[in-house]
Amino acid sequence: MNRVIEIHAHYDQRQLSQSPNTNFLVHHPYLTLIPKFLLGALIVYAPYSFAEMELAISGHKQGKDRDTFTMISSCPEGTNYIINRKLILSDFSLLNKVSSGGAFRNLAGKISFLGKNSSASIHFKHININGFGAGVFSESSIEFTDLRKLVAFGSESTGGIFTAKEDISFKNNHHIAFRNNITKGNGGVIQLQGDMKGSVSFVDQRGAIIFTNNQAVTSSSMKHSGRGGAISGDFAGSRILFLNNQQITFEGNSAVHGGAIYNKNGLVEFLGNAGPLAFKENTTIANGGAIYTSNFKANQQTSPILFSQNHANKKGGAIYAQYVNLEQNQDTIRFEKNTAKEGGGAITSSQCSITAHNTIIFSDNAAGDLGGGAILLEGKKPSLTLIAHSGNIAFSGNTMLHITKKASLDRHNSILIKEAPYKIQLAANKNHSIHFFDPVMALSASSSPIQINAPEYETPFFSPKGMIVFSGANLLDDAREDVANRTSIFNQPVHLYNGTLSIENGAHLIVQSFKQTGGRISLSPGSSLALYTMNSFFHGNISSKEPLEINGLSFGVDISPSNLQAEIRAGNAPLRLSGSPSIHDPEGLFYENRDTAASPYQMEILLTSDKIVDISKFTTDSLVTNKQSGFQGAWHFSWQPNTINNTKQKILRASWLPTGEYVLESNRVGRAVPNSLWSTFLLLQTASHNLGDHLCNNRSLIPTSYFGVLIGGTGAEMSTHSSEEESFISRLGATGTSIIRLTPSLTLSGGGSHMFGDSFVADLPEHITSEGIVQNVGLTHVWGPLTVNSTLCAALDHNAMVRICSKKDHTYGKWDTFGMRGTLGASYTFLEYDQTMRVFSFANIEATNILQRAFTETGYNPRSFSKTKLLNIAIPIGIGYEFCLGNSSFALLGKGSIGYSRDIKRENPSTLAHLAMNDFAWTTNGCSVPTSAHTLANQLILRYKACSLYITAYTINREGKNLSNSLSCGGYVGF
């Protein structure tokens, strides 16, 4: 027979004071010590062997005496602490004696902390000990499950707040925060120790996981210390896992190795987490500003990953790992402003594999003189795999420190491969790219080829026909003057299988040898492809004797015109050219630029070889005609006459001959701009309806004696549908109205609305956001069955537009729109029943006038739009009803109508647009809006004495298409 010990302890200072000297012993083979502070509220059920021990605890305990503070357990089958409410353990210090386990010390079996309700939480605060595990120490495993909060703050130890010799796991907790903890050893918060591999796991957390400002500092009494500012694992094969969690943040942690996480001989893995993953401002005295591990993986994340401003005094500003693997992540990944004093500004690794399923950017990372502004690959047989699958990869603004005898200076560098690489593979899916705006350096000789878009990557979901780009486009003027900032070097063979290898904007690519079996190689003015020679950066090497083979050559087009030649230099190797030339301008930038495309333009590629330039299988007869938008014309190709008979040097020329015609790109027409006036129209219409709704014909529906105030929220949407286009507009905000009864039959109202909005036209890359303010006033007069009402509204709308384009940059525009709307109407009651219900007919006239200011966009090739206006005069007619059910204190009231509206005068918005770069103008119109509509409105009011709650809904259908809906609700009080 097995029975379970269950200890219910609620920490209460009054209970403790009543029996401070009480002594109690529990004779149980596994329970070695129960703290005395539990005795005031203790229920004990004596167990026998082979059963888990359960202890239900809660309350707040501050301790000075270890005997009354530390809970010790030793049940081999495990000890479960049941947490029913908040448990706080704080202000305990034991620094003059070496002893592990500040709050909990577990000598055998697994120790678990199990939350049993929504308020279950544990707080460890200011617990300082000279030993391991200021919060919990276990000779076996530790588990935290189903807690609302788990907090550790301001504690100190010689190894972790939570320390175990086996596993430490966190499951199904809601909020975890570890801040300002210090370890004079390893693991500022969590430490795995012992002589067997263990794991730290965070699984299925329902809230944020936060490690902030934790430290692991060195200790003179410990041989290896200062590892893992937040988490440390020592034994080979140990695993640190974050699986299926929400937000994860490591910020401001520090250590000697691994500013946030240290697991030198094990695995650090982030798998399938739904929230953002961020490592920010973590630092280390040695390697791994954020992470130091043998194997790092971040896979299947569905939110952004960020490594920002981490720093290492040696290598790996963000990550120091032998193996780095990033793949199947669905959101953006950014490594930005990480630094390493020696090498690897963001990453130092031996084998690095990165696959982009969304954008991956390495920007503004910096390394010391070992190089690798973004990535440093070192060790035996380093390998690099970069794959742009369904997102692009870009390196920009990364630098390394270049030291000479005279000075040291920053030099741009994205990747440096220190030893002879075993494998370098670059592959981009069709319509995707890998951009190196900073050079790549692989100086150690190797016969293993660099493979670009190799056929082995071909799958039904991946076509290796994308672009690998080496570019100097993002360099500032001072940096461009140093040719080293634009020169990538591979002391290995380079093999282009498919897609495009583009060398542009003055970039240079120097390779051991080059072979092309498919795809295109593109060179823009001032760029070059060269085999290294004695005069190249490879000192002591000689030029390759293998032929430089090109079977698909393209002229790359830069945005700015240039007279510089592109070059292909084969050195001592033969240069063999076959196929036919083409133009590489995937985004059509050349044809949009009047400075280049409106006039004749030439580009040249110089081909040189000390052996022979063989063009016997190359033809220049084909023309390339612009079939895109922009300036029209054709490219003609020819050999410069004075080099035709020169076998070692030839110049290939591409000549652009324009026709003078310009074709506007369809998605640049700008239809969303005049269409945005309908957003202001919707703003005015909604504000006018909200005001008129509370000027009911039956005065009893608004319980106002002299003065009333109404406050509520309102929202509206408007859409148009036709065979050609669809547009969508939405507004959301708040409204307030004051109502004054001037006489028993005359009511004055006034107020305002503040509404935000969004609008766009389907299939156009333009999105407009708006913020508008409306001021309005209304007047209603009742003469028996006849009611006359009028409203006047004035609006100011601030608009901002972003155009998401695939070209060099997005464009942005800002402008104001002004609007006025006035209504005048009358209604007549023709049926009334016992002061509870009436039916009336109505007829109104509504006039709206809206003016948009002229504006010019900013960004690449901006558009200018002239001022435009929208004028609309409509006459709605129909019948309506009102009812009132209740008494003088409590009542349910309602109002509704059905009607028909006809626009008797309409001036649709139309604007003149202009492209300054192209000197081209055109007229653009907003989307078509029908001039007749059917309307349906309903309002319900719940009144109690002078207070009311209301909800109002409007629907307008124009010619069979749902055009607009609005909904408002709020409260009213009268005095």
From Swiss-Prot:
One of its GO terms (cellular component) is cell outer membrane. GO terms for molecular function: ubiquitin binding. It is found in: Secreted, Cell wall; Cell outer membrane. It comes from Chlamydia trachomatis serovar D (strain ATCC VR-885 / DSM 19411 / UW-3/Cx). The keyword Signal applies. Residues 699-975 form the Autotransporter domain. Keywords: Cell outer membrane, Cell wall, Membrane, Secreted, Signal, Transmembrane, Transmembrane beta strand. It holds the Pfam family ChlamPMP_M. PROSITE patterns: AUTOTRANSPORTER. Its main location: secreted. This is Probable outer membrane protein PmpA. Residues 1-51 form the signal peptide.
